[in-house]
Amino acid sequence: MKQNETAAVLMVLMAAACWGANGIFINILTAYGVNGTQMTLVRMASMAILTGIWLAAKTPAALKIDLRDLVWFVPAGALGLFMFGLFYTYSIQLVGMGTAAVLIYLMPSLVMLFSVVFLHEKFTPGKGLCLVLSLLGCALVSGVAGGVTLDAGGVAYGLGAALCYTLQNILLATKLKKYSPMTNLFYMFLFSAVASLVFTAAAGELPGVAYILTTPGALAANLGLGLVCSLAAQWLYTAALKT
């Protein structure tokens, strides 16, 4: 395996570990009485601000994009990233971390399959083996094979999260080589935050957002959710695809 390929595999594994921490932070926030809509808004908005500040301070030129590419960035953020975060949060709350992990880890498999169908990438025996082993491993470690009771809504949210993330990857597949991972992340977080704000306001959930911002424990957990499970995970996975 080439050095670049090894680095990409390691980054995907680290991204998976970051995604796996979702349940820890979500369970803490749930104990504070925070719902998925509220924590998703704080998560996406805070990460948009942080990535924006980072780019403005380090590489301001990276904030410039071709306006024609908004046709890719808007749905990637508003649909792919926002709905992914929202659906995955609800899935964890309804079916628990183990089962939600099985469902969400379908997304690399879906990305691979969609890439073969829509982007005409080669489906090799190695990819097929990785696909089978990843799905089998998720099922074994989650306890699904041991008779876990599944909530239909939680399963639907988990599958929806996997599909949304697949959509995000397909939409950006032709743009990842053009922009840096941080540029992609900033605009995805930005449009995800806008979509989340509209959704949260329409649902009448903004008072809950104010509660998070004024409660140190809830705010710390929400920032951890954003930094580890959104920023770090997304950057690692996006960088791996670029590699």
List the predicted regions and their residue ranges.
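Glycine-/small-residue-enriched transmembrane alpha-helix faces in small-molecule transporters
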Residues: 1-42, 147-174, 194-198
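Membrane-interface helix termini and inter-helical loops of multi-pass transporters
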Residues: 24-36, 62-63, 93, 141-153, ...
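Hydrophobic transmembrane alpha-helices of multi-pass small-molecule transport proteins
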Residues: 51, 74, 114, 123-144, ...
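Juxtamembrane C-cap of transmembrane helices in multi-pass membrane transport proteins
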Residues: 18-34, 39, 46, 85-95, ...
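Transmembrane alpha-helices of multi-pass small-molecule transport proteins
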Residues: 31-83, 110-111, 164-171, 185-206, ...
